[in-house]
Swiss-Prot record:
GO molecular function ontology, one term from the record: glutaminase activity
Protein name in UniProt: Carbamoyl phosphate synthase small chain
One GO term of the biological process aspect: L-arginine biosynthetic process
Role, per record: Small subunit of the glutamine-dependent carbamoyl phosphate synthetase (CPSase). CPSase catalyzes the formation of carbamoyl phosphate from the ammonia moiety of glutamine, carbonate, and phosphate donated by ATP, constituting the first step of 2 biosynthetic pathways, one leading to arginine and/or urea and the other to pyrimidine nucleotides. The small subunit (glutamine amidotransferase) binds and cleaves glutamine to supply the large subunit with the substrate ammonia.
Lineage: Bacteria, Pseudomonadati, Pseudomonadota, Betaproteobacteria, Neisseriales
Organism: Neisseria meningitidis serogroup A / serotype 4A (strain DSM 15465 / Z2491)
Reaction catalysed by this enzyme: hydrogencarbonate + L-glutamine + 2 ATP + H2O = carbamoyl phosphate + L-glutamate + 2 ADP + phosphate + 2 H(+)
Length: 377
C-alpha cells in the first residue's frame, strides 16, 4: 500500500501525492528544473543544497541509478518532486531503482501531483519555501512550521556547509564507454580548485585537458593557495547566497593581485564579480535546466547551456575593467565576464553540463590557454 505525502508552499498552496522515497519530512526552497534526463546528477549536485527540486518532465526514474553518475559524495537536494515514477527501470548501467536510491540516501520525495500546475505557480510567483511530509499524520500546520523555520535562501552561506574539509588531489578524467573514467598520461598543469560545492564532472573535464588538481576547502586563504604554486586557480559552483561568503571574496581579491589565471563557474562567477566590486541579486525566476540559450557576445554564436542558480550578477554594477562576454537569451541576465587587465574570466552556467549539453566546454580550453600563456611569459 502506498504512503501518502503532502507538499505545502509558503503561499499556502497544497498538493497531495504519494511518497516515493525516505519516510519523513523536509523543507527548503522549491524550484523547478526542465531537464528531461539526468535526475541523479541533479540530486547529487551540491548547488541544490537546501532546495526541493521539481522535475518538469513527467516520467522520472526510467533508467534507474548507478554509481558512475554521481556528481558528489551524497545527495544534496533537500527533496524531490515528480509527476510519475515508472514501475520498472531499464538501463545497462543501472544498479538500483530511483526509489531504492532515494530511501538509501534518506531523501524525501513526492510523486503523483500535478507538476504542470506547480511549475506554473513557481514561474508566476517565483521560487519560494516549501515542505514535504509523508505518512498519514502529515499536516498542513506542521508543514507551515517547517517552512517558517527554513526562511529564505537570501543570506545563507551554504558553500562552507557542502565544501570538503580536507585538501585532496584529483587526476581522474572523463568517462568513456567500455573504459570507465580515464586518467590522462600527462597532466602538465597544476590547478588549485576551490570546493564551494564542486561537481565531479568539472574536475574530470579539467583533468582530461591535462590538469592535475589540488582541491581545497572553501575557506582556504589565498596565501595557502599560492604556497601550492599553482599554474591557475579554479572557483567552483556552489549553493546559497554569494554575498555572505566574505572569506572567499577576500581570497579571490588577493589571488587576482597575484596575476595567476583564474576561472570561475556559477558561484565562482558571482564571487569574482563581488571581488571586483559588482553586486549580486536574488532572482525572482531562477535558472534550472539543461536547455538555456546563451549568446557568446564575442563570436555571436548561440550556445545551449546547463544552468543552476538563483542569484545573478547585476550587470549595471560592473567596473570598467570587466567586459561582458555572455548573456542569457531567456531574460538577458549576465552570463559571463572577462577582466581586461588580468587573466580572469567566469561563466554563470555550467560548461561541464552533467546533465545537459557541453556547448560551452570551450571555456575550459580557454582556461588552459591562459595557463599556457602565463607559463611562457
Amino acid at each position: 500500500m502506498s504512503t501518502p505525502a503532502l507538499l505545502v508552499l509558503a503561499d499556502g498552496s497544497v498538493f497531495h501525492g504519494t511518497s516515493i522515497g525516505y519516510e519523513g519530512s523536509t523543507s527548503g526552497e522549491v524550484v523547478f528544473n526542465t531537464s528531461m534526463t539526468g535526475y541523479q546528477e541533479i540530486l547529487t549536485d551540491p548547488s541544490y543544497c537546501k532546495q526541493i527540486v521539481t522535475l518538469t518532465y513527467p516520467h522520472i526514474g526510467n533508467t534507474g541509478t548507478n554509481a558512475e553518475d554521481e556528481e558528489s559524495r551524497s545527495v544534496y537536494a533537500a527533496g524531490l518532486i515528480i509527476r510519475d515514477l515508472p514501475l520498472l527501470h531499464s538501463n545497462f548501467r543501472a544498479s538500483e531503482s530511483l526509489h531504492d536510491y532515494l530511501v538509501r540516501n534518506k531523501t524525501v520525495a513526492i510523486a503523483d501531483i500535478d507538476t504542470r500546475r506547480l511549475t506554473t505557480l513557481l514561474r508566476e510567483k517565483g521560487a519560494q519555501g516549501g515542505a514535504i511530509l509523508t505518512g498519514a499524520d502529515a499536516t498542513i500546520e506542521k508543514a507551515q512550521e517547517l517552512i517558517a523555520a527554513f526562511g529564505s535562501m537570501v543570506g545563507k552561506d551554504l558553500a562552507k556547509e557542502v565544501s570538503c574539509t580536507e585538501t585532496y588531489e584529483w587526476t581522474e578524467g572523463e568517462w568513456a564507454l567500455g573504459k570507465g573514467f580515464v586518467t590522462p598520461d600527462e597532466q602538465p598543469y597544476h590547478v588549485v580548485a576551490y570546493d564551494f560545492g564542486v561537481k565531479t564532472n568539472i574536475l574530470r573535464m579539467l583533468a582530461s585537458r591535462g590538469c592535475r588538481l589540488t582541491v581545497v576547502p572553501a575557506q582556504t586563504s589565498a596565501q595557502d593557495v599560492l604556497a601550492l604554486n599553482p599554474d591557475g586557480v579554479f572557483l567552483s559552483n556552489g549553493p546559497g547566497d554569494p554575498e555572505p561568503c566574505t572569506y572567499a571574496i577576500e581570497a579571490v581579491q588577493k589571488l587576482m593581485e597575484s596575476g595567476k589565471p583564474i576561472f570561475g563557474i556559477c558561484l565562482g562567477h558571482q564571487l569574482i564579480s563581488l571581488a571586483i566590486g559588482a553586486k549580486t541579486l536574488k532572482m525572482r525566476f531562477s535558472h534550472h535546466g539543461a536547455n538555456h540559450p546563451v549568446q557568446d557576445l564575442d563570436s555571436g554564436k548561440v550556445v545551449i547551456t546547463s544552468q543552476n542558480h538563483g542569484f545573478a550578477v547585476d550587470a549595471d554594477t560592473l567596473p570598467a575593467n570587466a567586459r561582458i562576454t555572455h548573456k542569457s537569451l531567456f531574460d538577458n541576465t549576465l552570463q559571463g565576464i572577462e577582466l581586461t587587465d588580468k587573466p580572469v574570466f567566469c561563466f554563470q552556467g555550467h560548461p561541464e553540463a552533467s546533465p545537459g549539453p557541453q556547448d560551452v566546454g570551450y571555456l575550459f580550453d580557454k582556461f588552459i590557454g591562459n595557463m599556457k600563456a602565463a607559463k611562457r611569459a
